[in-house]
Amino acid sequence: IGAAGVAFNTAAAENSDLATSRSLILVTPDGQRTMNTYLGISTDFNRAEVDPAVIEASNYVYLEGYLFDRDEAKAAFRQAVDIANKAGRQVALTLSDSFCVDRHRKEFLELIRSGIAILFANESEILSLYECGSFDEAVVHVSRDTKLAVLTRSEKGSVVVSEGGPIPVAPDAVQKVVDTTG
């Protein structure tokens, strides 16, 4: 990952009672998956861990929606977005989970509209974000809120939403789905 130019400049946490994050993924014979994730020490993300120099030296800053639960983390997200925007950097956000979106819809929308350039979401997450009944309606909304959105739709493929409009991406033909963990 480092050879591809991706940096993970995070020191190991010290003096915490929380364990390392874990994810248990169960895959059924039809390839569908169920995840049970324990975020552990990741939930302690806060403003002290946001390094302006690292953000200013980056091309992209990637924010993981799962970490948005605590107020300290929300403040860190906002700080990172502010630093990145002032430095002319691109900020990407993944919505992570429709339940996460349900918990933080208003704040996610505020964050997205404040300077998220790239949004990653699946169909259920984007429908939850905009509280609408159709995927096409959600595409209209997201096109107003961010420069680029990449929306996955399982067996229906994906849709890339940019200033030029939505671009459908057909799924690859697969003989047998082994695992849908993405």
Model-identified regions with their sequence ranges:
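Conserved N-terminal subdomain of the carbohydrate kinase-like
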Residues: I1-L63
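Structural recognition of alpha->loop->beta junctions
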Residues: A4-A7, K106-S128
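Hydrophobic beta-strand scaffold residues
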Residues: F8, V91-A92, A149
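Distinct, well-ordered alpha-helical segments
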Residues: E49, A75, V101-I112
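A short, aliphatic-rich alpha-helical micro-motif
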Residues: P52-E56, I112-R113, S143
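Active-site beta-loop-alpha junctions enriched in small/polar residues
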Residues: Y66, S96-S98, S124, S154
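Short beta-strand/loop segments at the ligand-binding rim of alpha/beta enzyme cores
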Residues: A87-L95
